[in-house]
């Protein structure tokens, strides 16, 4: 059952994983942006970002994040998620001559604590690109001549909410604020690392396996629902979240079944009141099954 929920959240339908903007008539090659919204899964994204950096040697790598509620202790000590990820990318690229300039290709925002703030950094970067080309919303003769292919990398089950957030912010910044023209964007592509293609892959990243994977996926789905219906901060529409058709009803049934299957485990996790103890229970495991520094289960 959890695989069906995971596939929905991780955009495994090709139609969900890529958005083509057919409103651009700009010719010439596209500029590529590799975009990363920071979280505690950043370690798992390193190899995918390195691979994309090799494939697109001129691509800029935008990394946004900071220190939030679930930022890992040693990442906090390094100064925040973008600084940690930059360090890891630099380490991995050091053995590859073609990536010797990877540090200079990275652009960081280290002041965000929530996904929406992370995404606004991407919008700000696009607006600066438009400004440098002379874009002016009040001047009908002004144009932006460059187009951008944006590749978004994140842990699989987080992609649907991130996609909805990005699409909503693009609408706000192109139609309301008019910070840049929508014709600048050629496409959005959403990618998860090779080792997080299934719910089973996700389970392997957590000490308590299937129970924690179910806990996090159920929580992510309910967050997606709340953010699109106004029960929480309404950050995007049900249509952008993919909750406007019969799929939503099907996924609710899956969630209900998972809650029944993992009732005892979910009750135990939901009853944890101490934030540090909750982190210990649900944080991911990194290389060689070594638990993140500073936590002892």
Model-derived features: positions:
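C-terminal accessory extensions appended to soluble enzyme cores
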Residues: 202-297
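A structural signal for short, hydrophobic/glycine-enriched beta-strand patches
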Residues: 1-217, 285-297
């Amino acid at each position: 059952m959890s695989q069906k929920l995971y596939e929905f959240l991780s955009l495994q339908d090709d139609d969900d994983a890529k958005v083509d903007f057919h409103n651009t008539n700009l010719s010439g090659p596209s500029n590529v942006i590799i975009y990363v919204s920071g979280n505690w899964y950043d370690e798992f994204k390193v190899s995918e970002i390195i691979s994309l950096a090799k494939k697109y040697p001129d691509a800029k790598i935008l990394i946004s994040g900071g220190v939030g509620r679930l930022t890992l202790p040693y990442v906090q000590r390094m100064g925040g998620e973008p600084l940690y990820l930059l360090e890891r990318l630099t380490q991995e690229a050091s053995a590859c001559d073609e990536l010797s300039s990877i540090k200079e290709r990275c652009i960081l925002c280290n002041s965000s604590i929530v996904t929406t703030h992370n995404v606004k950094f991407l919008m700000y970067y696009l607006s600066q690109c438009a400004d440098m080309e002379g874009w002016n919303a009040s001047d009908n003769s002004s144009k932006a001549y460059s187009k951008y292919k944006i590749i978004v990398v994140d842990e699989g089950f987080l992609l649907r909410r991130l996609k909805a957030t990005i699409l909503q912010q693009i609408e706000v910044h192109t139609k309301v604020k008019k910070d840049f023209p929508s014709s600048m964007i050629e496409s959005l592509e959403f990618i998860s690392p090779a080792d997080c293609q299934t719910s089973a892959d996700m389970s392997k990243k957590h000490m308590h396996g299937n129970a924690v994977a179910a806990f996090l996926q159920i929580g992510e789905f309910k967050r997606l629902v709340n953010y699109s219906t106004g029960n929480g901060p309404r950050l995007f529409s049900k249509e952008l979240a993919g909750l406007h058709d019969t799929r939503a009803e099907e996924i609710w049934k899956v969630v209900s079944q998972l809650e029944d299957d993992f009732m005892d485990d979910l009750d135990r996790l939901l009853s944890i009141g101490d934030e540090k103890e909750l982190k210990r229970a649900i944080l991911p495991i990194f290389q060689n099954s070594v638990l993140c520094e500073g936590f002892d289960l």
